[in-house]
Regions:
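Short, small-residue-enriched loops and turns at beta-alpha junctions
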Residues: 10-13, 43, 67-69, 109, ...
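Rossmann-like adenosine-cofactor binding region
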Residues: 79-167
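Short, charged, surface-exposed secondary-structure boundary motifs
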Residues: 12-18, 71-73, 167-172
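Phosphate/diphosphate ligand-binding glycine-rich loop within oxidoreductases
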Residues: 1-24, 142-144
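Short, surface-exposed amphipathic charged segments that create phosphate/polyanion-binding patches used
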Residues: 18-23, 99-106, 172-176
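Glycine-rich phosphate/diphosphate-binding loop of Rossmann-like nucleotide-binding domains
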Residues: 25-103
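Short, acidic/turn-prone active-site loops that include or flank metal/cofactor-
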Residues: 7-11, 65-67, 161-165
Length: 176
């Protein structure tokens, strides 16, 4: 049978594929789909989204603290391949008109990070995204100090649909 990486500390390509399929179906158009990432992006789902941006024409906007930048060789490869990836230290710029907002990991998951680094997903930041923007997080729900109650409620509301999409994607991949 096929070997499928359904997710671990290094990545979650199955989740990335499922999320992208769900978000594209929800939005209806790859070309204008804007995905935002807020927080650390050294590994995991963030790197899978960077890789996916090589093959799918969505826009990936990432607000990254200094300690949370993705692998530079992966980023360089993606940009050379034509991926539409935009990096910033300004979360307001990154979240503006986003159709999906990922809450990346915080400094507690990065040994080199100062404890004060990173941005929580506040109501003020979330208000910059599209009104119906999906809120997603790296491992289930983010700790309450990383997101407002509104953001956590939106992430929780989207979680069942996201989990179902992942199970469907994994079933399709296992059937190969």
């Amino acid at each position: 049978g096929a070997v499928v990486n359904a997710g671990n500390d290094k990545g979650a390509p199955g989740q990335a594929l499922a999320d992208l399929a769900l978000l594209a179906a929800r939005h209806g158009d790859w070309e204008s789909l804007r995905i935002s990432w807020l927080g650390g992006a050294q590994c995991g789902l963030a790197c899978d989204l960077i890789t996916a941006a090589i093959y799918a024409p969505f826009e990936l906007f990432m607000a990254l603290p200094e300690w949370g930048e993705p692998d530079h060789s992966l980023l360089d490869m993606a940009l050379r391949a034509g991926a539409k990836i935009f990096l910033s230290r300004d979360p307001e710029l990154v979240l503006e008109n986003a159709h999906a907002v990922y809450m990346g990991h915080g400094p507690e998951q990065c040994a080199a990070a100062p404890l004060t680094s990173g941005w929580p997903l506040t109501d003020e930041l979330l208000a910059l995204a599209a009104e119906d923007a999906a809120v997603l997080s790296w491992h289930g729900l983010a700790p309450a100090d990383r997101a407002s109650d509104t953001a956590l409620r939106r992430a929780a509301a989207f979680w069942p649909e996201r989990l179902a999409a992942r199970r469907l994607m994994e079933a399709r991949l296992y059937a190969l």
